[in-house]
Structure formats: structure tokens, C-alpha cells
């Protein structure tokens, strides 16, 4: 895939622009970080050249001048919400985030529990856990009338009931495990607390998507709409920016809806607002670092199709209606893409049709397509991985990397001792067997050395993957989709 984004140019421009905003504010700046600070896989998929750690690398330029505050919604703790991309709970992700920030040399010692109510026992337990770990925890309550009653919100009965976070640096980055965590309210509550203490402070937003200086229906912006289809977010033209500057800028519904209130709050807190529009609040320079628009458009279309398949599978797993996939289908239509644009889909379905059993296909980074079929020894995903490694290593397809003699003892262990009904090897078992074989086989060693070249490849399977295969593909960095059907009929399914 062609590079479409200049990582180094972005880091340089973005850090400079944040400093310019700090000078404009002239005091403490609370910077709300939308999206993922690191592990930003979505951005890396739709902007080829953007690395998952791009934003944190940019902030490293400002490391000695900032501190990081993590917000988490108490209701998300009660719901045991998880990060789907990492398959960990928000609770654990807060700890993971702080660990990574500290390993990179950032000051991170504060957590804000937002929208806490007295019966949020899970959140209260988590608060105690954080405090035992030496972290400072501030509690923000549910404020009646938020976010519409500005006069009450900006008062002792509003933000005044929240605990104030004593920050020590003039750039405070507010981040969270996911959307809806209360980052904006945390920033505004802190500005209120600063105002009560005579401290000058302001607010800015760093949201990667939608990209304000790309057209409303640019595929990169549409890919963001597909990614947030479960939140019912939509991209819109910023009406305030258009009125103030007679210039079109892309924003999204929640920012536009909250802007009048935000502007009013800033005026009540500091006498005036520096912003005429939601776009003005942002400091995003991502659009200015795109160097190949066509490459980014194609990458974004592929991401939209992947999101569509993910929605179909999620709806099948959870036995939900097709609301989210239907929304993404509309986005696909706007972007001018279909499932046929994902080349691996047709090839995987061809394998299933010709064999009468589940099939799998992968598109290598040079465009070659490799398939895998279900056999008595291997599941189709495991077979596909072996075939792809052989293709990459230049090993003839007829060569067996694993002998039946090495596979059969593993099958016996699974079915006779570990209670598995399925004797076929999963991808993890195949890779372990291949690693063992590599000790004595030059051919197996050559194949294993190609494992790193699967990263970023597209895969499609004709049945919903089990958790093991799904986890292995995630760890390998493979972009996998599935047809929304199971291999066998059953009511109970292990996850």
C-alpha cells in the first residue's frame, strides 16, 4: 500500500500548533484528547504512514511541560465496558494507559471518576484500588441539568460539587479509555475550579477525526462515521464556522450541539470565549500532513468495508437487529465502495463453495492472494497462515511444513485430555508446532521468519472466528473480517 501520510511532518506541525494555542490562551491549557493517544489503529489504517503511536510521539516533544489526567465514566465501570480492539476492560485499560505514560516519561498521577453516583459500587471499589496503587482520584458527580442548564452548571451546585484536581503543569492533557468518558466535562470543571482560585486557564480539543479541512464526504471522514456508527455520530458542516468565516469546515453532530453551551460556559467563567466555532476549538493538523490523497481515500474505503463486516458479525453474535450495519451500508454508498472491493471476500467464498467447508483468504502486501481450506488436520485459518508463510518464503505449496506425525499428538491431547470436540489445529497451535519444527528444519525456519510480513494484510473467513484465532490474528496485526455465520449450529457459544 502506498504511503499517504507524512509522520514526521505531522509531529513537527502538531506540537508547534499546540504551543501556539497555549500562547493564545496565556495560562493553563486543558487539552481534550479525542480518540486513542496511542494504539490508534484506526488512524493508522485510514492514513497509511500514520503509526499507532503517532500522537504520543508528538506529545513527547512537549513531555516536560505537560501532565496527563485520565477520565473514566463510573457508568462504564458498572457496565464492565471493554475496548474491543484490545479485548480488555476500561478498568484495566486505565491502569495500562498510566503504566505506558509513565514508561515514556510522562507525569501521570491523577484519575477522574466522572458521573459517579452513590450506588456505583463497582466505581467506588475501583477508586479504592487506584488509591491503594498510589494514584490520586477525584470524583465528579452527575450534575442535574447538564449539559443544557448553563447557569446551574457553572455554579456551586454544578461544577462546584466536583472535586478539584491539583495539577502542577500548564499543559494538561485529558484522555480516557474510550468515548463518552466525560473528558469535556472534566476540562470545564477544572476551568471552573481554576477560576474560583484565581488561575487563568482555557480549553482546546485535539480530535483526529473528522478532519476539519477535508470535505464532509471525503472517505477518511466517512470512515470515522463508520467507526462511530454505534454512537449514531454523523459528520456535518460546522454552521458556526460557516457563519463566522464564510468557510466550510467538517465537524460532527456532538461538537456542534454542545458548542453554544461551551461558548456560554467559557464566557461565564472567563468573561469571553476565544472561539467562534467548534472548529476553532480544535488544534488538529492531521489533514495538513496528508501527502497522497488517493492512497488515503483507498485505505479509508477498505476500512469502511471492514467496519461493515464487523458490524454484521457483532449483530449476529449479540442477536441484535441490523441498525448499525444498516448505517454503515449508507456510509459505504456515500464512499462509493462495496464488499466486492475487499478482494479476499470473493476468494474465501470460492474456497467454501468448492470444498463445502469453511474457507479463508489473505491478501499479501504485494497483492498476491493466498487461500486456506478446512481439512481433517487443520482449520481453514491455520491452513491459510501456513500457505501464506510458504508463499512469502518461496516454498513450494506441495511441501508440508508440519508432518501429520507432528500434528496427530496435538490432536490427541486436545480431544482426549483437554475436552475439545474439534480435533483441527487452531492458528496458535500451528504456530507453536511450526516453532518446534524450526529447531530442526531449515524450511520451517524460513517460513517462521516470514511471520512479521503478515502484519497489515487483509484476511477474510467464511465463518465467525473463535476467540483463539481472533486473538492470534490481532496479535499478528492482520486485518480480519468474517461472514456473519457460525460453522455449526448451537445455542451456547464460548467466548
UniProtKB/Swiss-Prot annotation:
<dbReference type="InterPro" id="IPR048496">
    <property type="entry name" value="DUF1846_N"/>
</dbReference>
<dbReference type="Pfam" id="PF08903">
    <property type="entry name" value="DUF1846"/>
</dbReference>
<dbReference type="Pfam" id="PF20921">
    <property type="entry name" value="DUF1846_C"/>
</dbReference>
<dbReference type="InterPro" id="IPR014999">
    <property type="entry name" value="DUF1846"/>
</dbReference>
<dbReference type="InterPro" id="IPR048441">
    <property type="entry name" value="DUF1846_C"/>
</dbReference>
<comment type="similarity">
    <text>Belongs to the UPF0371 family.</text>
</comment>
<protein>
    <recommendedName>
        <fullName>UPF0371 protein cgR_2887</fullName>
    </recommendedName>
</protein>
Amino acid at each position: 500500500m502506498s504511503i499517504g501520510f507524512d509522520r514526521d511532518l505531522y509531529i513537527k506541525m502538531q506540537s508547534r500548533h499546540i504551543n501556539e494555542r497555549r500562547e493564545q490562551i496565556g495560562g493553563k491549557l486543558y487539552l481534550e484528547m479525542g480518540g486513542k493517544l496511542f494504539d490508534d489503529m484506526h488512524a493508522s489504517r485510514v492514513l497509511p504512514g500514520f503509526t499507532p503511536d503517532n500522537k504520543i510521539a508528538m506529545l513527547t516533544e512537549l513531555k516536560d511541560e505537560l501532565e496527563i489526567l485520565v477520565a473514566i465514566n463510573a457508568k462504564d465501570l458498572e457496565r464492565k465496558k471493554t475496548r474491543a480492539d484490545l479485548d480488555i476492560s476500561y478498568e484495566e485499560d486505565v491502569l495500562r494507559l498510566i503504566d505506558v505514560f509513565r514508561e515514556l516519561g510522562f507525569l501521570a498521577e491523577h484519575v477522574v471518576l466522572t458521573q459517579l453516583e452513590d450506588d456505583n459500587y463497582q466505581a467506588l471499589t475501583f477508586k479504592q484500588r487506584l488509591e491503594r496503587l498510589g494514584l490520586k482520584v477525584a470524583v465528579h458527580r452527575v450534575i442535574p441539568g447538564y449539559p443544557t442548564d448553563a447557569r446551574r452548571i457553572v455554579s456551586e451546585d454544578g461544577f462546584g460539587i466536583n472535586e478539584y484536581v491539583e495539577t502542577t503543569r500548564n499543559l494538561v492533557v485529558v484522555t480516557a479509555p474510550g468515548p463518552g468518558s466525560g473528558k469535556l466535562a472534566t476540562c470545564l470543571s477544572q476551568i471552573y475550579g481554576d477560576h474560583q482560585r484565581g488561575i487563568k486557564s482555557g480549553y482546546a480539543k485535539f480530535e483526529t477525526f473528522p478532519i476539519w479541512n477535508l470535505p464532509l464526504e471525503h472517505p477518511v471522514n466517512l470512515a470515522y462515521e463508520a467507526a462511530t456508527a454505534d454512537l449514531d455520530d454523523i459528520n456535518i458542516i460546522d454552521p458556526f464556522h460557516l457563519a463566522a468565516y464564510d468557510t466550510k469546515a467538517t465537524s460532527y453532530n456532538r461538537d456542534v450541539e454542545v458548542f453554544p453551551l461551551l461558548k456560554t460556559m467559557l464566557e461565564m467563567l472567563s468573561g469571553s470565549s476565544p472561539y467562534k466555532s467548534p472548529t476553532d476549538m480544535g488544534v488538529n493538523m492531521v489533514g495538513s500532513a496528508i501527502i497522497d490523497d488517493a492512497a488515503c481515500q483507498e485505505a479509508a474505503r477498505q476500512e469502511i468495508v471492514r467496519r461493515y463486516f464487523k458490524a454484521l458479525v457483532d449483530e449476529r453474535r449479540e442477536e441484535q437487529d441490523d441498525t448499525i450495519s444498516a448505517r454503515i451500508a449508507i456510509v459505504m454508498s456515500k464512499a462509493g465502495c462495496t464488499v466486492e472491493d475487499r478482494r479476499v471476500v470473493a476468494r474465501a467464498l470460492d474456497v467454501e463453495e468448492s470444498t463445502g467447508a469453511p474457507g479463508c483468504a489473505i491478501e499479501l502486501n504485494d497483492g498476491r492472494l493466498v487461500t486456506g481450506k478446512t481439512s481433517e488436520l487443520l482449520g481453514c485459518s491455520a491452513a491459510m497462515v501456513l500457505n501464506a508463510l510458504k508463499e512469502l518464503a518461496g516454498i513450494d505449496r506441495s511441501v508440508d511444513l508440519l508432518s501429520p506425525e507432528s500434528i496427530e499428538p496435538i490432536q490427541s491431547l486436545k480431544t482426549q485430555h483437554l475436552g475439545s470436540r474439534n480435533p483441527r489445529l487452531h492458528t496458535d497451535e500451528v504456530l507453536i508446532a511450526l516453532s518446534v519444527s524450526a529447531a530442526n528444519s531449515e524450511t520451517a525456519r524460513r517460513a517462521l521468519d516470514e511471520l512479521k510480513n503478515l502484519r497489515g494484510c487483509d484476511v477474510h473467513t467464511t465463518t465467525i472466528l473463535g476467540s483463539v484465532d481472533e486473538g492470534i490474528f490481532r496479535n499478528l496485526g492482520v486485518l480480519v473480517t468474517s461472514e456473519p455465520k457460525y460453522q455449526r449450529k448451537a445455542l451456547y457459544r464460548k467466548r
